[in-house]
Structure formats: structure tokens, C-alpha cells
Swiss-Prot record:
One of the record's GO molecular function terms: hydrolase activity
InterPro entries associated with the record: AB_hydrolase_fold, Xaa-Pro-like_dom
Gene3D superfamilies, per database record: alpha/beta hydrolase
Pfam families xrefs: Peptidase_S15 (PF02129)
Xref: SUPFAM superfamilies: alpha/beta-Hydrolases
Organism placement in taxonomy: Bacteria, Pseudomonadati, Pseudomonadota, Alphaproteobacteria, Rickettsiales
Protein name: Uncharacterized protein RP471
Coiled-coil parts of chain: none
């Protein structure tokens, strides 16, 4: 999992990158929590999510936002951080032109950034929002998801003292009711706090289960397309 640097809008951006063996492996970008509260790409939740994605065959990049670790610049209240995430996704795509799909995962503040990028980048196929900061003291607004264009997974602990589980549930309900064909999966881990302390096994299983689901759906969709293609060829031959 080598350390990398690439050019961002405010100078270099630092990241950790793990490339899958398959050239068409799906790619995933992982975003960390609030930089002013010691959030960085080595946060335990971020690292564990990164490792789970790697273990599931993804090519994965996690980054430090501007002003964090080896990334240049300074905190920009979420505005510049969205641009950083976009630059990171550009880098991932340029280095993996045959990737079969694009996924973005964010934890806490990183989830807010991730969801904004979802609205800007139509090539993103799935999102994972871990402990999204709905109605916190920072008043992060998720109303820009109108509607949410892609399916995703929201993971929350019921003992979260930073983000109310009820507020997250309200967000899930709102997103789920926007478009009937867009499925928003939601799971609460009992006893888990904002950082899923002492709940690593349950945390890992929840993400693993979701990744398995979307991969099986992807293969099912591909098989249907292959069958259609075969039928079209038969019709042409006859």
C-alpha cells in the first residue's frame, strides 16, 4: 500500500494507494473525517474501510485533504475539500482507465464531502456514507441530494453521541422516497459510537455484506447484457 503524491488544486495531495491485480477492478476513493478534529487518512475507521475494499478486490485510494499530513494548502470548510476529492477521483480514473465501476466512501465529514462529489460526478456508481454528520453543531446540510442519483449504503451506530441516529434515519427515509428505483441500504450497529469502538467485527461485516451485494448485482447485470448480445447475434445470423 504505497504512499503517493499527486497534484491538487492547492499543491500536492498525499495518499495511500492499493492497486488490484485485475486491470478492470472497480475503483474506490476513501475520505477521512474533519481535519480540525484530528481527522486524517490514517483514522482507524478510514483505514479499516480501505482494507475491506482492498480485500474485496477494489483498487483503492485514500487521501489527506489539503492541510492535513503531507497534503499542501489549508482547511477550506468543505469547499476546497470537495475539489481535492474530485482531483483524487481524476487521478484514480486516469491510472485505471478500464475500471468496471466507481465507488466513493466517506466517514463523518468525509461522508458529507463524498455525497457532494456524487452530485458532481455521474460516473460514480455507489456510495458508502459512514456516520454522516446530519444536523451536527456544524450544521452540515444534505439538501443538495435532490434527488440522490445513485444507490448507496449508510452505516450508523445507535450510541453515536455526535450524530443522532434519528436524524440519520430521517435522511435515509428522505433519500429512499425520492426515486423508487434508487435503493438506499441502511444499517444500525447496536452499541456502536461514532467511531465504532469495540465494534470492528460488526463494522467490517456490514461493509463486506454490502460490497458482496453490489458485486453480485453487477455480475447479474453483465450476464443479462451478455445474454441479450448472444440473442441479438443469433437473430442476425438467422
Amino acid at each position: 500500500m504505497p504512499q503517493i503524491y499527486f497534484n491538487g488544486p492547492e499543491g500536492r495531495i498525499e495518499g495511500r494507494y492499493a492497486k488490484a491485480t485485475s486491470p478492470n477492478a472497480p475503483i474506490a476513493l476513501v475520505l477521512h473525517p474533519h481535519p480540525l478534529y484530528e481527522g486524517n487518512m490514517n483514522n482507524k475507521v478510514v483505514y479499516n474501510a480501505y482494507k475491506i475494499l482492498v480485500d474485496n478486490g477494489y483498487t483503492v485510494l485514500r487521501i489527506n485533504f489539503r492541510g492535513v499530513g503531507g497534503s499542501q494548502g489549508k482547511f477550506d470548510n468543505g469547499v476546497g475539500e470537495v475539489v481535492d476529492a474530485g482531483a483524487a477521483l481524476d487521478w484514480l480514473q486516469q491510472n485505471n482507465p478500464n475500471a468496471q465501476s466507481n465507488l466513493i466512501l466517506g466517514f463523518s465529514f468525509g461522508a458529507w464531502i463524498a455525497m457532494q462529489l456524487v452530485m458532481r460526478r455521474p460516473e460514480i456508481n455507489h456510495f458508502l456514507a459512514i456516520s454522516p454528520p446530519v444536523n451536527t453543531i456544524h450544521k452540515y446540510d444534505f439538501s443538495f441530494l435532490a434527488p440522490c442519483p445513485i444507490p448507496g449504503f449508510i452505516l450508523q451506530g445507535d450510541n453515536d453521541s455526535i450524530v443522532s441516529a434519528d436524524d440519520v434515519k430521517d435522511l435515509v427515509n428522505r433519500l429512499s422516497n425520492q426515486q423508487s428505483h434508487i435503493k438506499i441500504d441502511y444499517k444500525i450497529i447496536n452499541g456502536a459510537d461514532h467511531f465504532f469502538r469495540y465494534k470492528t467485527e460488526e463494522f467490517s461485516k456490514a461493509i463486506n455484506d454490502y460490497l458482496i451485494t453490489i458485486q453480485s448485482n453487477y455480475h447479474h447485470h453483465n450476464n443479462i447484457n451478455e445474454d441479450k448480445s448472444k440473442n441479438q447475434k443469433k437473430l442476425f445470423l438467422y
